[in-house]
């Protein structure tokens, strides 16, 4: 079963086991409607946990899990990630892709010369930023129209003619 990252537990809140979750989704309202998540450090070490209460506030999700009833129990979840199955992924609007489809894509310049490989995506307030591994170095590239010439999902290639400016 393939699992997909959708949130990260940041900290506990209050005495009754509530946790603050960083959302890694374009669909926060779908996130808080979920009744369960696979929770763990990585997709290979998860347990299925039932959500008893969920809310959105201040750009974060606030969750209560079944069996997590104290501050101390909630503290044990800090740093864990929340995953969902492929069947639970919300359909993407046209011209949108999932994060997991971008990670691993090749970045090439306008001449087709390989620049590097996308290893992560950061959701920043103004726009997303691609983390790209280039010959052992990490380079951050803005994911904006001015730099991204084309995005070819079938060939897993992002064309950015100005990528060399960021070295």
Swiss-Prot record:
Q: Where is the PRC barrel domain?
A: 94-166
According to its UniProt entry, the protein's GO biological process terms are: ribosomal small subunit biogenesis; rRNA processing
GO MF = ribosome binding
Give the record's GO CC terms.
cytoplasm; ribosome
Keyword annotations for this protein, in alphabetical order, are: Chaperone, Cytoplasm, Ribosome biogenesis, rRNA processing
What HAMAP family does this protein's entry cite? Ribosome_mat_RimM
What is the similarity comment for this entry? Belongs to the RimM family.
Record text on subunit structure and interactions:
Binds ribosomal protein uS19.
Q: What is known of its domains?
A: The PRC barrel domain binds ribosomal protein uS19.
What's its job?
Answer: An accessory protein needed during the final step in the assembly of 30S ribosomal subunit, possibly for assembly of the head region. Essential for efficient processing of 16S rRNA. May be needed both before and after RbfA during the maturation of 16S rRNA. It has affinity for free ribosomal 30S subunits but not for 70S ribosomes.
Q: What's this protein's name?
A: Ribosome maturation factor RimM
Query: Upper taxonomic classification of the species?
Result: Bacteria, Pseudomonadati, Chlorobiota, Chlorobiia, Chlorobiales
């Amino acid at each position: 079963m393939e699992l997909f990252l959708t949130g990260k537990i940041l900290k506990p809140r209050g005495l009754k086991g509530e946790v603050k979750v960083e959302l890694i989704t374009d669909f926060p309202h779908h996130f808080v409607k979920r009744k369960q998540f696979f929770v763990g450090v990585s997709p290979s070490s998860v347990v299925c946990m039932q959500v008893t209460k969920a809310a959105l506030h201040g750009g974060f999700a606030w969750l209560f899990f079944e069996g997590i009833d104290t501050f101390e129990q909630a503290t044990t979840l800090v740093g864990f990630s929340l995953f969902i199955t492929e069947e639970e992924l919300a359909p993407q609007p046209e011209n949108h892709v999932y994060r997991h489809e971008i990670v691993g894509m090749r970045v090439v310049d306008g001449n087709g010369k390989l620049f590097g490989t996308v290893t992560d995506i950061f959701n920043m307030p103004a726009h997303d930023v691609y983390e790209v591994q280039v010959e052992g170095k990490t380079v951050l590239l803005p994911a904006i129209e001015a730099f991204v010439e084309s995005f070819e999902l079938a060939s897993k290639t992002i064309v950015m003619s100005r990528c060399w400016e960021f070295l």
